[in-house]
Amino acid sequence: MIKLEGIHKSFLPVIYSGINQEPLKSLFENILPAISFQPREEDIFKVFRMPIDKIKIVVIGQDPYSIPNEASGLCFLNETNKVSNSLKNIYREINSSTGMEGDIHCWEQQGIFLLNSALTVETGNPGSHISYWELFTSTIIRYISYKNPCIWFLWGKMAQKFEKDIYSPFIVKGYDNKLIQDIPISNQYNYILKAPYPITESYSKGASGFYGCNHFKYANVILEKLKETKIQW
């Protein structure tokens, strides 16, 4: 049931530890064998094929698409190339703030770690496995933030509840396109950018919504100041 082929060795110790602890142990041994679930077995841990030292930005999603054959193992990325409303709004924000069109398919190769809060879901039952994965996800977030401080996109309440697990946080808040140029820079900081989840309802609420969050522009400013290659969104 548990397929770990392709996982980078930098993640193997923490993954082995996590899947042998409750409640994940019960999920894999008792629940998943008896139900239809998403994504495919070989894609459950797909996100961990990236070496930890290559991560520049972590995007925390919710749980996999529960419709058969749509979940890819990476947040926001649909296996059928269907563009969800959330991803449409992400692309709109990318275009508005950077002038780029946006293509999530090229993100992983640039060091963007597309982590769902839960890595499995019962087919047709969104949110059904979130409680099983919460401890594991917290552990992964602590591990990444300690081993390789980076930039974090926390969109929505589900992602933001993991903020407490991030070491040495620097909250990117109160900046605009001019002030962001003066942001304090340290390779010891985990830069946290927060906004509502990019659903249609939150996209159009101006300063209180996803629209105008400027995360994609600000992330590139931070990367450039850290002497890292900027993201081609």
Tell me the role of every PLM-derived stretch.
Residues 146-152:
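Short active-site oxyanion
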Residues 37-49:
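A short, well-structured juxtamembrane/interface segment
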